[in-house]
Swiss-Prot record:
One of its GO terms (molecular function) is proton-transporting ATP synthase activity, rotational mechanism. This is ATP synthase subunit alpha. The lineage of its organism: Bacteria, Pseudomonadati, Pseudomonadota, Alphaproteobacteria, Candidatus Pelagibacterales. It is found in: Cell inner membrane. PANTHER family: ATP SYNTHASE SUBUNIT ALPHA, MITOCHONDRIAL (PTHR48082:SF2). Its EC number is 7.1.2.2. The gene is atpA. It comes from Pelagibacter ubique (strain HTCC1062).
Amino acid sequence: MDINPSEVTKILKEQIKKFGDKAEVTEVGQVLSVGDGIARVYGLDNVQAGEMVEFSDGSKGMALNLESENVGVVIFGDDRKIKEGDVVKRTGSIVDTPVGKELLGRVVDGLGNPIDGKGALDKATKRSRVEVKAPGIIPRQSVSEPMQTGLKSIDSLVPVGRGQRELIIGDRQTGKTAVAIDAIINQKKINESGDEKQKLYCIYVAIGQKRSTVRQIQKTLEEAGAMEYTTIVAATASDAAPLQFLAPYTGCTMGEYYRDNGMHALIIYDDLSKQAVAYRQMSLLLRRPPGREAYPGDVFYLHSRLLERAAKLSDEHGGGSLTALPIIETQGGDVSAFIPTNVISITDGQIFLETELFNQGIRPAINVGLSVSRVGSAAQTKAMKKVSGSMKLELAQYREMAAFAQFGSDLDASTQKLLNRGSKLTELLKQKQYSPMTVAEQVISVFCGVKGYLDDVELKDIAEFESKIIEKCKSEKPEILESVLSSGKLEEDTEKSLVDTIMELKKNFNS
């Protein structure tokens, strides 16, 4: 076999050309101890707080405790594959998540990875840091646009505006999630109108819930056709505590994408009590000193930095908004516990749900006396403001009188009238689950109650009367609904036409 020296030389020269002297430098450390989802790592001297690190088995973690001797890392996922002496690599990146419209209709985990079996996200999807500072004072503006929930009792008495943070608080099994899901479903008609300025994209964050519950919510939204403008971020009960702690921030970052690009988004945190418990678990395992109820000292900051990111931006900054509906579960109606009081003080109002009302059949079980919106009528259309103005006062007087009426039987006519009106209004505010109403339908319904047109209608017939008057307006007087929807006002001639329609129905209804 002949060897041609020139060929050998050519090959060698090519090999030398390809040879590079660039070595890949990575900062690595070693696992000192691991257990309960926490790893103590030695050697990562330049690691940043909140930085992602990678273990030799491919699992990820986040550096939270930066101490002089070692670094405390919380592990995302199973820690059983990690053992003492394993190599830990810095990734150089702070925890981030995919953002954008590609996530609509998807279910993702606490890190933004799809878990719905519909395939991976597009590689070109934008990514954004999970922990960012909330907008300052100058970029914000006052809340002025309504965020319609489709529930009469909320839209008329505790209105929520775009860019507001309204807490939903109550014991277990009082319908907190149902209120939030109704708010998502109600956006369908608004989003179908095609007006990009009115569209509201929704993000539902499930923290520490059963997988079956999350699946049920996904199914409900799909059946209502609401998944096409919704993203579900799920850190279920079987997920590691760091993922449950991180999921709300991940969801918030996804919502901020819409807010910062001049669009509107709604985010629901279900629920923040479980996030606080997950954070307490992490903090205690990281040997951080406990405070009240064994929560760490910065548990207030945990929620305040999250909820402050919900805002209505000024027109110079695009005029986008992020509305937050955090949910808190109380124990035995105790709203003076640590986490409930914290979140009440951070938010712009709260919707109280009570077990007692729920069991009486008043659903949604909203305690109108204790519920408040600190934005108030600024977040209502003129028509709703006009018809529901006196409603809160009438219901407050009714509750006061109802308490005294139990003791006395001989009541004067005005008291009897007040009690009658109050019971009719309470009945009117009941609403079936997953059947939200448009603003125009709500205005007609509340108008009937407040103006006294239901005073002589039997209590059991109120729901039927309400559905009939709305049906009659839709079929015979659609201009009433159109006028309220287009102008947001209840004009004099529209009101007169509505009164005539009500009187016409009452003639046939009572006979």
